[in-house]
Amino acid sequence: MRRWLAGLGLLLSPALHAALPVEPLRLLGEHPLDGMPSGNFSGLARCGDALWAVSDRDDDRLYRLQPGETAWQAEAQTFVVPPLPGSGLPWGLRARTKLMGTLRGGEMDLEGLSCDARGNRYLVSEAHAAVLQLPEIGQPQWLALPPALLRQARASGMLLKFNAMFEGIAVDPAGERLWLAAERERRGLLVVHRVQSVWQCSGSCVLRSEDGPALPPAQLESSRSWAKSFADLAFHGDKLFSLERLAHQICRHSPSTGEVERCWSFADALLADARRYAQPWGSAEALWIDAEGAWIGTDNGTLPRGDGETRPMLWHFAAPAEGWNGAP
């Protein structure tokens, strides 16, 4: 009976998600980034006293974001990527990924960044379905993720298509729980737990798996549907937050079940004529949440927005009046 009820909850959760009230977020500021020549701003986290970013075109560096008057400066910190472990992905996906990385740059395709309280930084590679840990002191190393993670994800219909793999990562402050987002077709949320020094699935690694098309926000006045997608994850106040690229929303989830609890919209601000990009599925790609607000970064691939700006952008939104953990 409990399994039947759990399955019913998974079936109903998209409908419940759609019925939740969505409050607009208030834009506090926007900051173009200089110093990220490849563009493709794809991950964001506050580590220590600074915001850090990654680009999915740069395999060997993080960027420390320094505030400025007219633009923020992205200062590169390089590292050496260790040899890759076996990913467990099928040959066809691996071959296509290698070819694309050679043609466009960014063989790792880094698509997310998170930090724990000890200063460890975690970068997720979409191309190889792997997580790289950069300790504050010591050499980078790939996490030994459990084989069941990939096996369960693919059995649930995720991680089956090229360029639709892991697209976001979040780690709790203790460094004991790590969440990954499968981007699209199907999209989903997965979690692994660190027990002593071993990462493992505690029961199922899959928290949430869903598919299906959705319309973009009404501001775009479009009748064409696109695949639902996750763009990034963040962890704050013992809650998991997802960046919903197509919907132009941030959604709060239960970290143990993946259930959607509440969503907030940034569509009014980002789809104003001057800030709008041509791609209808959205360009928001990086997310950080703290008590004061939300930071969102754009992966626009140097394409211009409505006012002609081509640099990556960092947007700062105020937190909801009742806080991120408030009830609808």
How would you describe each model-predicted region?
Residues 2-7:
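Sec-dependent signal peptide recognition
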Residues 13-15:
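N-terminal signal peptide c-region/cleavage motif recognized by signal peptidases
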Residues 19-328:
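Sequence/structural signature of beta-propeller domains
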